[in-house]
Amino acid sequence: MKLRKLLSLSIAAILLCFTGCVNKNTLSKHEPITILAPYLECDRLVDLVHKKYPEINLKVLSYSGANTTTYLQNMLAADDLPDICTQTIYDPNIDDVSDRMIDLAGYDFTDNYVESRLQDISDDGAIYMLPSAYSCIGITYNKTLLEKHGWKLPKSFHDLEKLAKKAKKAGVQLCLTQIEYPGYGFQYMCNIADTAFLGTFQGKQWQKDYLTGKANVSDTKKMMDCMDYIQKWKDLGMFTANKKNPQSDDETIKEFMKGNTLFLLGSKNGIGETDGTKDKFGLMPYLSEDGSQNVYILNVTRFHGLSKKLEKDPQKLKDALKVMKVNSSVEGTSALYEEATLKANLLPFKDWNADNTYYGDIADEINAGNTAPLIYVGWENTLVNTGYRMLEYIQDKATIKDVVDQLDKDQDRVVNNKPEVITTTTEVISQKSCAKLIGRCFMEATKSDAALISLGKWIKGNGKEQNMAGVNGKLYAQDITESDICSILPTGWYDTIQTVQLSGREIKQLCKDGYDAAGTGNTYPYVLVKDKKLEADQTYKVVICGAGKELTLNDSGIVGMNAAKDFFSKFKTLSEADVK
């Protein structure tokens, strides 16, 4: 019996060892699952995934550049996608991604989402991208002021008209409107129209028709009815700029915080929590005339999906689906965001509790589907012009007809106008080559002797911003516009080029040490661009993108974007062979 027992134990031990070896080999055979989620807390997601699925190796790719939306859109267009894809904007009515992304509709983790949020991203029943955290835009109101006068929150525009009379009689201002940016004007117009025709199925079809040149505003009666409704808002007093400095959002909020204004049209939610006031505030929807189509406006900050290329590798697809399962939960999505961000946003899940957020009072309304998506994609070529015209209208410098005329006038630009092409890349220009080109560009612009351009990459422990001072990403084979250049440009849209005086020895040491952006000791490499051999004891004027605090910088005063446009426009076409 003892012999049998020992033999059984020995066999069990051998099997256990064998099983252990198989598991280790299996683990080692799991290819990394790549994810690119710019400016999110990916370290925490990696830790959470590893805790739940130790066999999965989640590899974070990095992008910390100045134009996230354009870069992610270019990746999508080129089908150069990580396994887990991210986009900042997505409209299934406009964006067809069925040939590049997996339909997730049949997977059980989609059941975690509120039905109304799935309807927002449904592509004829298919689901290619799932929403992450989102913000909600409505009309801020002063709860304390309403309670003080015994007034009820209006549930329709008709109610609002009655309340306006009471407010006027009591000496209370009805509304203040923020007008610092032209985008506000465009959104006010769309948000109000969403409570009428624009927010209906037919209205959504009209949007497609406008964007393709098949319909305009002035020839569409129901859209003209929307414009008439906007006029009613103005006549009632809902469009009122602050008198001290109309273009300052801060001044408008200060005026609102004095406590004698009922409503605020603007971009900021959560007013009152840190603004030094005892008044309490809430958020109400944009109101339809009879209250049957009131809407909050939703702006999803990130969408996530899976690359269709995963279908060629069953093991990777299996692992990627597990990551998506984690990401499609309150715990997983919460890991990606800071606490303050979570408090100011909503999550799209059935089991998410909104009580500790600014939206606690209205979460049920939002989940019930009383919402409309933020209108932006496709409208970029009229957004600023129409927005400005709306702001003029708010200030009595234009009429509602002027707004209509602007939309009709801009339609050709919306349908046909393309941004200026600066050069055309005939192949992918790698990140390192982009850094060399930027270095050469900035050297020429500042008449410098050399350039140190740091490279972005993901380093665990360096936070969600990683290296914003360097070159992030690459250029794809396409026509290159200002937006594309901005996506790789360390100085972004408006920043100026910085230089520093360094000896050849110091330059060599910096190349060895790298750029410590996060102060963790985990550094980003520099690409050194130079025209001549650098002598150790000689001092040089050096362009630097990614400078430690110990360096004394000199501001050239030259805007990096201007220099880059001049530099890249010299190339009719651009390839790796042009990189020196």
Regions picked out by a protein language model, each given a short descriptive name:
Residues 211-244:
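Glycine-centered hinge/linker elements that transmit conformational signals in sensory
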Residues 88-137, 152, 282-284:
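Hinge/lid segment of periplasmic solute-binding proteins
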Residues 416-580:
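Catalytic centers of hydrolytic enzymes
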Residues 83, 110-146, 174, 289-297, ...:
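A structural signal for short loop-to-beta-strand junctions that line the ligand-binding cleft
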Residues 128, 161-215:
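Extracytoplasmic/periplasmic solute-binding protein
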